[in-house]
Amino acid sequence: MKTLIRPFIYIMSALMVLSFTSCNDFLDKEPEGKVPEEKVDYTNISNMYQPVSGVYAKIRTSGLHWVIWEITTIRDQDVFSGQWNGSDYYNLSEYKYNDSFWGFNELWMQYYNIIKTANAAIESLDLYAENITNDSDMKNYKAYRGEVMFMRAYAYYRLVQAFGPVTILRDNNQVDLSRSTANAVNKYALEDLQYGIDNMPRIRPNQSEHKGAVTAFSAEMLAAKFHLNMGNYAKVEELTNDIIEHGNFSLYPDFYQLWKIPGKLCDESMFECQMTDFGNGSGDLIDGDQWFVCQGPNNSGSDISGWGDCGILKSFRDWAYARGETIRATTSFLLADSTTPDGDYIRAQVDPKKTDCWNGKAYTPLNQLTPGRTKYGTNNNARIFRYADVLLMNAEAKIKNGKNGDAPFNEVRRRAKMPELTNVTFQQVIDERRMELMCEWGERYNDLVRTGLAKTELKGWSEDKALLPLPFNQYTQIPDLLKEPKDE
């Protein structure tokens, strides 16, 4: 792991500086991190993975921006900003949007930073391919290209979830920045994913040559999530069946440790963003900046402390306890004035305007931190996609297709020590997703919107509030964004 990441520390430090040098990165035509072509020896095929590593790093520095995480999760039925204070963050949970809110612009820019970096990486890979002379290297080239296309599709997936119609940036010198419909963007991203499905190895990410790299099964999962949002249940069933039958994935047996250091890159992992402190108490550190910290509890005087954002509402906790949840509740609810299973005490919340419960999935115990490290969540990975979601998508698709979804559904419940159910219904799957995927990348909000349940489940929500507004900074500088989206 150390040898894979270290060569890119200094490269990506420079990229992080570049990403903050413009008030509107979407307008910049030159992709961040693109090494001038005359300085790269594209005949040296041994360096061909470097552009791919750069895109993974961009996922970490851009895709894990703390404000993106908060915008993505706060609209969930069960999560709020953590403070009852009328801020732009709090208003998200009441579906009141301000198009001048800097966070919306940041979300837009950072996902396009990923897309531009992916576009540049594909250009570089294609230049390497011109010098390939054997089948083995050509196979690697196609697999590496598939990894980059997966990450580009991932950025579009998040953009469509947030804004609906967005710009398809086919290359970094594109002049036409008008938007395409959500269906057109989905189709474009699915083409990327199909390339990955066809050319990446059919193994788990933790079996990859570059451990943790996405695989054909990761691409199938993301494709299934696109199709789930589009209501294409036959395709969801087909894709998730293949993962279940041939992917050799399994649920990590300990739900609590799944989110801790022991659960990094386990057999449940479909896609996660990797961090490391290289086993050292000081010095080089690759992390998600404030991604973990923003979710940490108000716990001054302890290294188990963060900003206190992303509060878990009591109404959801009551719902979970009424269901009989124990394992998932203990793991997911990091409660004030309580001691965790690892012995870390979380102080009582003295401010009634702030939450008294935080996301336990982002908690790394003190006894798992490398001695000398004190930053909340250091050396842990950010989980993005996991096999439990595949099982629940499969169950939902089977039920919608008139079949029985009990087997995949109950596989998830068994780990949580919840009673198995028979003749599982669609609503039971949606409820199971609510508990299992709590505070994971806005899954609850997405589920309610895509199924039409939002209008009855979300107070203050209406169809016209399903999507975030176009950022003011974008449409004022790029008037073409206000044109009617095209279906291409």
Regions of interest found by a model, annotated:
Residues 23-71, 240, 471, 479-488:
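Membrane-proximal, proline-rich intrinsically disordered regions
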Residues 38-42, 46, 65-86, 166-170, ...:
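Short, surface-exposed recognition loops and adjoining beta-strand edges that mediate ligand/DNA contacts
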